[in-house]
Amino acid sequence: MNRTSTLLSCLILKYERVKAPQKKQVVVLILLFIASGTRAQFYKDMSVGINGGIYVYQGDLTPDPMGSFKTIKPGLSLFAKKPINYFLAARLHMSFASLQGDDSRYSKPDYRQQRNFYFYSPLMEFSGQLVWNIRGRNYDDYGIQPYVFTGAGVSFIRVNKNYSRMNTAYFGETSDVYTGLVADNAHGTPRALLSVPVGVGAEYPLSERFSLNIETSYRFIFTDYLDGFSQAANQKLKDHYHSTAIGLIYKFGVKKKGLGCPSVN
């Protein structure tokens, strides 16, 4: 007989043995026990975590198709995860970071040093995710546990763009860059973006309660104005960003202990 059913049996036996005036008190105790048991069951196997890592902007202000590793920024994430079954878990994720892109950091192609676009934005994101434990070990506390995940969320940004360093003589006022800037300024910059995170990671249990985790996540954000530039740069390609982080996870749960109440046959 498990801990919950044993305690409940004790309370029921007490209810049957006490006098009528005291039965109301026992009923209240039973109801409180059921409520606390429901809450404990909800938190059972739930885990929370914190990790830190790097955020990489991928867009018009870098020639590298993998993103601007010359302007990486730090970030911090908090999350809570609850297993649904052995393979699947639901996760709430919140991150605080920043993104940056800078043409001047690249000497090739030559025009980047002349265009000299720059942007910076703080970033705050919230997402709900589904996490697939590849080995089906959501309830285990041993062995490496690789996983993949995806979900949907919102990324809040505040774009600060700068084109004051541009060599206008190099491009000319009739160039596509100059006319594109006029259009981009008229368009403005977004403050909130729909994001779809897709990533992979792994957990390594250190004990019954603690685990290390490392993961990388790519965000699809469906806009070309993450950096504030589109028609003045490359409007055919959307902007994105990705992150890689390492952190620590704490798993809730109550160890089974003796209760001092005899079991009921």
Stretches found by the model and what they are:
Residues 60-66, 111-119, 135, 183-188, ...:
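Extracellular loop and loop/strand-boundary signature of outer-membrane beta-barrel proteins
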